[in-house]
A protein has these predicted regions:
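His/Asp/Glu-rich mid-to-C-terminal helical/loop segments that flank catalytic regions of hydrolases
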Residues: 194-224
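Alpha-helix C-terminal capping segments
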Residues: 61-65, 83, 174-182
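A C-terminal functional module that forms or caps the active site or interfaces directly
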Residues: 146-195
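Active-site-proximal beta-strand elements of phosphoester/diester hydrolases
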Residues: 44-48, 141, 186
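Mid-sequence, gly/pro-rich, charge-dense loop/helix-turn segments that line enzyme active sites
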Residues: 79-160
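N-terminal short beta-loop-beta anion/metal-coordinating cradle
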Residues: 1-63
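Proline-aspartate-enriched helix->loop->beta-strand connector
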Residues: 67-69
């Protein structure tokens, strides 16, 4: 299997790179792409940078140049579901934008014109991950903001079922959708999307990234 991995931050890819063999790194249009192998799988990994544009650019570059069988977006997120706690892992079975509003033209809140409101993760891959660990799964929402109390309330008005919020997954999903490439999103909870989120995030972002990486490596182990 050839798997493409998009991580927003360096802290979120440490565990993944450490697990690879035959590692090489090259620049592609200003984006650093790391290639390696893990138990027979070809792994392509990039740190996209934070935000939707950065994530979309990195995803398009990866798919166009390397044609992975599966795109995985890993990293951290802020909890919207009150049952989640720091360190928990979430599988995004579907993702949506939390900051797109063209409702004046008859689209649903969060829907980009002429695109689906929800981008669906590959159901077969989701089922495979379900066998690995008892994690929460459901809707992940993305927007270009670090979510705290006020934004959290607004998001939950539009997406009351959302589990976590972050800044890249929907952009990764939209690009994968347009290329016809299967995808899945794995996010570790780094903060509770409240008034203390900024401080807590700095303390737990590495732990959250490590949780996502370990779950992904378990999936690759199961496919070896």
């Amino acid at each position: 299997m050839k798997i493409g991995i998009i991580t927003p931050m360096a802290e979120e890819k440490i565990t993944l790179i450490a697990a690879l063999e035959d590692v090489t790194t090259k620049q592609h249009g200003g984006t650093e792409i790391t290639s390696g192998r893990y138990k027979g799988h070809e792994v392509i990994l990039t740190e996209s940078g934070i935000g939707k544009v950065a994530a979309a650019s990195a995803t398009a570059l990866m798919i166009d140049n390397f044609e992975p069988d599966l795109v995985v977006n890993t990293g951290s997120a802020g909890a919207l579901d009150p049952d989640l706690k720091i360190g928990d892992e979430v599988i995004g079975t579907q993702v949506a934008y939390s900051d797109v509003d063209v409702t004046v033209f008859g689209y649903a809140y969060g829907q980009v014109p002429n695109k689906p409101l929800y981008y669906q993760a590959d159901p077969t891959v989701v089922k495979d991950f379900e066998q690995l660990a008892p994690v929460k799964e459901g809707l992940i929402v993305s927007g270009d903001q670090f979510v705290q109390d006020t934004a959290k309330k607004r998001i939950l008005i539009h997406f009351p079922e959302a589990l976590v919020a972050e800044m890249e997954a929907a952009a990764v999903a939209q690009v994968a959708y347009q290329f016809g490439t299967p995808f899945i999103v794995l996010r570790g909870v780094s903060d509770l999307a409240n008034g203390d989120s900024g401080v807590v995030f700095d303390d737990y972002v590495v732990e959250a990234g490590r949780a996502s990486a370990k779950l992904l490596l378990s999936y690759l182990d199961s496919k070896a």
